[in-house]
Amino acid sequence: MPFITPDQLQKDYDVVIVGSGAGGGQMAYTLTMAGVKVLLLEAGRKFDPTSESPMFHLPSHAPLRGISTPDKQYGFHDCSIQSGWTIPGEPYTQANVEPSRQFRWWRQRMLGGRTNHWGRTALRNGPYDFKPYSRHGVGFDWPISYEDVAPYYDKVEMLVGVFGTNEGIENSPDSSPGVLLPAPKLRVGELYAQKHGKKVGVSVVPIHRAVLSARQDAETIPAKLHPGNPRAQRILAESMRSRAACFWATDCHRGCAIKAAYDSTSVHLTPALATGNLDILSLAMAREVTLNPQGKASGVTFIDKRTGQEGHVAGKAVVLAAGSQESVRLLLNSKSSRFPQGLANSSGKVGKYLTDSVSSSYGAHIPAYEGMPLHNEDGAGGPHAYVPWTLLAENKEMGLGFPGGYHLEF
């Protein structure tokens, strides 16, 4: 695998990508399969899920009884490395001293980014989500529609492997026939919710998750994704054959050494590296995007975290895929006489009005479960069922002051 050091950088690349998570991984995969020469900059270290995931370890294997460490904030039985709300050696400031008004986000410094600990719930945005102003009078409509994006949803779902069912529910789009893998059986609690949800008009249906419930069809999918490109088809087929189906036995948060659960390293970067068109420079913290005299992106300046030295890599194009906050940081850092407020920031709005998801959780004791025979229903290490977005218009109609709805996972 061509993991390189700064002194091994080529003079020029077709594309420089910052970030190796879902966006950066997919971009690297798509470009390299088409023959484009790509450099990927990753702020964290190299990570191999097949050899570093403690999915089969018993509690007795954990050092210090599994207590958290600077490297693993959630303890030994967690696949994350160098991740957390704060990262050692990366100080940052808050704009507000009141804790309730501070914005914090989870950062991941490892190859594959946050795909390593993402819950892998893989639902599509629906038609309403692309046109919030037309529907609710808030925000702005996207210049594209769900129909424009739908074919690409199909392609990504076939590539990464998503299980689920098509239910024909409002604003919860179905996949094309043959795209989804079979949904696993619902667990007892999910069946209980489904039974009683019907009484109050709430749909409880199989969720869509990026976990292989069955082996992928390596004979036909590569040709669908890469028509007319036999080399790309061969590389993808080999990658798909290296992934095993989930055997419903361990916690996905420990990582997935058998590649059943999606992560960028296993699904995107492995075949991208096999093309010979991808170099990966890890432990390289991007600092700013550099421009040519015409004002076009010409490369990225980075800090080598091994030595603290500054480096630069040239590229004909630059892709920022470092997550919303880190990509914003790079845009704002990239100031020049032509762009005094940073790149793509003539409005002065870059970095403002970021919105996080609002979520909560609850638990309950259900007497009906008492006395149930012991049985194994570990499943896919996360929900098998969910309540699709509901009450999409009722909130506003009932005078609650906001549009939107609610979504539940079990």
Tell me what each language-model feature is:
Residues 209-210, 282-298:
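A conserved short coil-to-beta-strand element within the FAD-binding core of flavoproteins
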Residues 7-23:
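Beta1/beta-strand and adjacent pyrophosphate-binding region of the FAD-binding site
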Residues 21-22, 26, 184, 325:
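Residue-level detector of alpha-helix initiation sites
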Residues 28, 32:
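Gly/Ala-rich phosphate-binding loop of Rossmann-like dinucleotide-binding domains
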Residues 33, 37-62, 258-262, 267, ...:
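Glycine-rich loop(s) and the adjacent beta-strand/alpha-helix scaffold that form part
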Residues 88-107, 111-114, 142-146, 347-410:
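FAD cofactor-binding and catalytic pocket of flavoenzymes
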Residues 65, 71-88, 94-100, 104, ...:
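Conserved redox-cofactor binding core of oxidoreductases
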Residues 45-71, 108-117:
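Conserved N-terminal glycine-rich FAD pyrophosphate-binding loop of Rossmann-like flavoproteins
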